[in-house]
Amino acid sequence: IQQDFDAKWYSDPQLRTNETFVLDAVENGCSPFKAEIAWYLREKSVPKPEYKAEIQKLKNISKKNLAGVITTNYDTFFEKLFDDYTPYIGQDQLVFSSIQGIAEIYKIHGSVTVPDSLVINEQDYETFNEKGKYLAAKLMTIFMEYPIIYIGYSLNDSDIQNILKDILLCLPNDKIERLQERLCNV
């Protein structure tokens, strides 16, 4: 899909949004497909009013009990909700940064703020999976120190399963039990 979209985007100017954000991203080497998706999600992602109370509860919990957020979502919901948290975008930023494990957001599939970071096509997922062991090693240090709460997606998600599998392969049985006690799925 991305290759077809990119070819059409270059050949048909009417397909382009002509937003500076998109044009700058493409000029810097980003795929038009990723740039347009990032722009669209930036513009259209708005919290639903019917979730206002739940969002406020999550914000209140974070002030006392939430060390960090790990998400596969591209949008900026968590950055806006927890504006004092530091976001780490993509595996490279997470793996090669000196993280503290407190007040941080780990956007493992990228972010709309960095369109080229989006894990969205087959090649992106292959690269993501190839580097999965490095990500798992970094996350393991966080998981062993802090409780883990999964919000919004199932533990049946293949990306989550792969990360957990990679972590479990590195741990002795007593540490696996400790990790299991720290997992909570909402």
For each feature predicted by the language model, list its residue ranges.
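Active-site loops and adjacent core secondary-structure elements that bind or stabilize anionic groups
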Residues: 152
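Conserved catalytic-core helix/loop/strand module for nucleotide-ribose chemistry
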Residues: 1-122, 131-146, 155-186
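Short helix/strand-bridging catalytic loops that position acidic/His residues to coordinate divalent metals
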Residues: 128
